[in-house]
């Protein structure tokens, strides 16, 4: 479909978002607090409804003519918990390879035209050539972060070409933390994932620690709390540091917002410990490491990674982070159109 008007759908663990773009200019964004985690518990109906609702809102708000807009999707919408399972492309993967592996999905109750869904990227050795140990150490999967990479690559190529004119590593904290190795030409060489965000959410809502943090979203960070939490994790482990949240409550050492900050810092410290042990960081001492995500978490990752690696660290501006996935998906769609995929 030859068009300059796009709706880019992106589904994650906890949210579904639709971005309306004209070319590379973002016009509007709508979101639903529904993700594939809801589908795991309630089949696919929550995600189907969320996607349909996002599309309906944009269509009505902007009087969109269906035949004049291309609808594309990425992220977990292309998984077995999303709209349809689109097989991963193996790394190393170029944007052209991912664009060429797109799948057209149709459900008239969601949108009256087919939606093009892009696959994710899988990292790892050939299972037939290695044992389970090698697979566990090296195998990984991602859906959605590849579009963030190519969206960032597009934006930074225009604004700060010196950053992406060399190999770089992206760390993107979220429900899951992704570390991605990227070539100077945008080729994705692999990914490495942890469960940090979801683990923090589970700890503060589904364990005894809930009594100590009260599911608080107000966190009073300080250099002392962040550094001490990291020290305990790096010397004694996350499980000990996490339980001290309860100790700090019972003994009155920290108030509720400080306890929440302690627990958050401890999980991030464990995450940074895992990232820093990966060969991309412990062998490439001069690697360029770009950190995305929201500003607060980003600052904590930058602080801790400076202590655990010798990489050159660049904190990405929020303007680059906010719409990277949508711009990357449009980049894939334009490649797909150009090559007749």
What are these regions (language model features)?
Residues 316-341:
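Glycine-rich phosphate-binding/hydrolytic loop that grips phosphoryl groups
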Residues 15, 284-304:
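Glycine-rich phosphate-binding loops at beta-strand->alpha-helix junctions
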Residues 231-274:
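Adenine-nucleotide phosphate-binding core of ATP-dependent small-molecule kinases
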Residues 61-139, 184:
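Short beta-strand-loop/turn "lid" adjacent to the catalytic site in phosphate-handling enzymes
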Residues 53-70, 159-160, 272-284:
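Phosphate/pyrophosphate-binding loops at sites that engage ATP/ADP/AMP, CoA/4′-phosphopantetheine
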Residues 37-43, 123-170, 176-231, 235:
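Glycine-rich phosphate-binding loop plus the immediately following alpha-helix
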Residues 6-46:
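Short glycine-rich, Thr/Ser-proximal phosphate-binding strand/loop in the N-terminal lobe
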Residues 9-15, 76, 171-176, 196, ...:
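A short acidic Gly-Thr/Ser loop motif
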């Amino acid at each position: 479909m030859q068009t300059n008007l796009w709706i880019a759908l992106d589904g994650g663990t906890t949210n579904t978002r639709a971005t309306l773009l004209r070319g590379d200019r973002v016009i509007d964004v709508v979101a639903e607090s529904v993700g594939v985690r809801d589908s795991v518990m309630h089949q696919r109906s929550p995600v189907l409804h969320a996607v349909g609702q996002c599309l309906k809102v944009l269509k009505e708000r902007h009087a969109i003519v269906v035949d004049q807009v291309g609808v594309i999707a990425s992220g977990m919408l292309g998984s077995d918990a999303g709209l349809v399972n689109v097989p991963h492309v193996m790394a190393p993967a170029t944007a052209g390879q991912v664009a060429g592996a797109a799948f057209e999905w149709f459900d008239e109750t969601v949108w009256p035209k087919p939606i093009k869904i892009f696959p994710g990227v899988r990292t790892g050795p050939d299972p037939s050539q290695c044992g389970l140990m090698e697979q566990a150490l090296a195998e990984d999967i991602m859906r959605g972060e590849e579009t963030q990479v190519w969206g960032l690559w597009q934006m930074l190529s225009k604004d700060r070409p010196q950053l992406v004119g060399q190999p770089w590593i992206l760390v993107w904290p979220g429900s899951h933390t992704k570390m991605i190795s990227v070539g100077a030409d945008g080729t994705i060489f692999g990914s490495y994932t942890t469960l940090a965000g979801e683990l923090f959410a589970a700890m503060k809502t589904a364990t005894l620690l809930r009594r100590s943090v009260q599911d608080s979203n107000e966190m009073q960070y300080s250099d002392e709390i962040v550094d001490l939490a990291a020290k305990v994790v790096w010397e004694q482990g996350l499980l000990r540091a996490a339980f001290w949240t309860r100790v700090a409550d019972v003994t009155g050492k920290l108030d509720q917002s400080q306890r929440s900050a302690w627990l958050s810092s401890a999980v991030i410290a464990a995450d940074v410990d895992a990232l820093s042990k990966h060969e991309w960081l412990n062998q490439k001492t001069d690697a360029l490491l770009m950190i995305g995500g929201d500003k607060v978490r980003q600052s904590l990752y930058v602080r801790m990674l400076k202590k655990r690696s010798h990489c050159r660290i660049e904190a990405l501006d929020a303007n680059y982070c906010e719409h990277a996935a949508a711009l990357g998906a449009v980049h894939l769609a334009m490649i797909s159109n150009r090559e007749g995929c």
